[in-house]
UniProtKB/Swiss-Prot annotation:
The chain crosses the membrane at residues 6-26. Pfam families: HOK_GEF (PF01848). This is Protein Hok. It is a single-pass membrane protein. Toxic component of a type I toxin-antitoxin (TA) system. Part of the plasmid-stabilizing activity of plasmid R1; when R1 is lost cells die rapidly. When overexpressed kills cells within 5 minutes; causes collapse of the transmembrane potential and arrest of respiration. Its toxic effect is partially neutralized by antisense RNA Sok. GO terms for cellular component: plasma membrane. InterPro entries: Hok/gef_toxin (IPR000021), Hok/gef_toxin_CS (IPR018084). Keywords: Cell inner membrane, Cell membrane, Membrane, Plasmid, Toxin-antitoxin system, Transmembrane, Transmembrane helix. The keyword Cell membrane applies. The keyword Calcium does not apply. It comes from the Bacteria.
Amino acid sequence: MKLPRSSLVWCVLIVCLTLLIFTYLTRKSLCEIRYRDGHREVAAFMAYESGK
């Protein structure tokens, strides 16, 4: 079954928004994500500045 192009775009948008909302609710910030596994830790930071 093939979805129309607009339906596919809406599905992707809903999935992305759901992931963002879940991340925001479970983390302190959307700009920092940490993953710990045993003795290793991976951290991803997003740095941003205003253009003004």
